[in-house]
Regions:
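Flexible loop/turn connectors
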Residues: 94-95, 166-173, 180-268
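Alpha-helical recognition/docking segments in bacterial nutrient-uptake
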Residues: 1-111, 165-169, 173
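Short, Lys/Arg-enriched N-terminal segment that forms or immediately precedes the first helix
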Residues: 284-295
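Short helix-coil-helix linker/hinge
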Residues: 296-303
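Hydrophobic alpha-helical segments within soluble ligand-binding/sensing domains
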Residues: 87, 94-123, 157-162, 182, ...
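An alpha-beta-alpha
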Residues: 107-147, 243-259
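Recognition helix of helix-turn-helix DNA-binding domains
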Residues: 313-348
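Short, basic, alpha-helical segments at the C-terminal edge of helix-turn-helix-like DNA-binding modules
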Residues: 343-359
Length: 359
């Protein structure tokens, strides 16, 4: 069994890629695995993998991933695993992911800035080509951020800053998509500007930069171990199309928020009532189908035979003779079936089942 690895060319220049690969190589040595690096797409296209072989795809660029995953799926079927902060959006494709829990990270940072009194929060440095940043953007909007509060990096952090600077006074806090954007922002802002800045994704460079950056930190070397553990599930279960693993990050306060820690989590003193806004389930037709489905799903073979004979118009005596039950036993069972289906009589139950051509 062989584990193949292919990396996004641009992403290979990043420390994130190197850390993920280092973790994978460390696991290779410890577990004595066969790991083969694919230098380019041509090497992938000429590959004839064995039945249990797995491919790891390291990258985050949406266009690159689109093409690579299509090629990998044709060769490895469900044994394709993306390692990297990635937002799964290629519906219908059989591939799995190991990623940071981006939605949680953004939610933590957004709530943290709100706890500091930041009334309007910006998301800064979003790369339109990154599936990771697309996920951060979605999470930011779900937290209450607005589209107008998102500042995109179209290949120029200086240009991104110029756009923010025009609206700077409107914001009380800024979430940067990664430490590179956070460092750039701090360097461009005047020293007198003390706006709280946090980052979704750490880098080694920020460990040397001053002021230190508040943000979420994750061990990228853990991606490899998680990917190998995930591969075993896929190898043993051909009916499993995809598995997503979300790795936990840790919050690290820094000087960009005066070292203030996360606020203590509070438990509500009173029970909170959460009302569903999904009107799908309040549709009387859906409610009725759900009742029929629940009834049939809970039936034993004997119950189904009873219902079948009821629909055929047989008398209690005929049904009892066929099922070796007394008339009272049949009536008792029928009473339970009516209760389960929300009907009040044999006629109502038969009418309900006939609606859906049951049996």
């Amino acid at each position: 069994m062989t584990y193949y690895v292919i990396g996004e060319p641009e992403y290979e220049t990043s420390n994130w890629y190197r850390s993920i690969l280092d973790g994978l190589i460390a696991e290779k040595r410890q577990r004595r695995l066969s790991v083969v690096m694919l230098e380019n797409v041509s090497a992938l296209q000429s590959l004839l993998p064995e039945q249990e072989d797995v491919i790891f795809i390291i990258g985050t660029n949406s266009k690159w991933l689109d093409g690579i995953i299509e090629l990998c799926e044709a060769r490895f079927f469900n044994r394709c695993i993306v390692l990297g902060n990635h937002n799964r959006r290629l519906c219908g494709r059989s591939y799995s992911i190991v990623t940071a829990d981006i939605a949680r990270d953004v939610r933590v940072l957004y709530g943290y800035l709100e706890s500091l009194g930041c009334r309007r929060i910006a998301l800064y440095g979003v790369n339109p080509e990154s599936t990771s940043d697309a996920f951060k953007q979605e999470s930011f909007l779900s937290c209450g951020g607005q589209e107008a509060d998102i500042f995109r990096n179209n290949g120029s952090l200086a240009g991104c800053f110029d756009t923010l600077q025009q609206k700077r006074t409107e914001y009380g806090g800024i979430i940067c998509v990664n430490d590179y954007c956070a460092i750039s922002l701090v360097r461009h802002l005047p020293e007198s500007d003390s706006i709280p800045i946090v980052s979704c994704c750490g880098t080694p460079l920020s460990g040397y930069f001053r002021p230190t950056i508040t943000g979420m930190r994750i061990d990228y070397e853990a991606f490899g171990k998680a990917g190998l553990d995930l591969s075993r599930i896929l190898q043993k279960n051909s009916n499993v199309n995809a598995v997503n693993i979300f790795l936990a990050s840790s919050f690290c306060p820094g000087e960009t928020t005066d070292g203030l820690p996360l606020p203590n989590r509070t438990v509500a003193a009173e029970p909170v009532t959460v009302k569903s806004a999904d009107r799908f389930y309040s549709d009387p037709e859906i409610e009725e189908m759900l009742r029929v489905e629940a009834l049939l799903s809970s039936c034993e073979p004997e119950d189904l035979e009873l219902l079948h004979r009821l629909l055929a118009g047989e008398t209690y005596a005929q049904i009892g003779e066929a099922l070796f039950m007394s008339t009272n036993g049949i009536k008792y069972k029928l009473k339970g079936l009516c209760r389960q289906s929300g009907t009040r009589s044999r006629r109502e139950l038969v009418g309900l089942l006939q609606k859906y051509l049951i049996f």
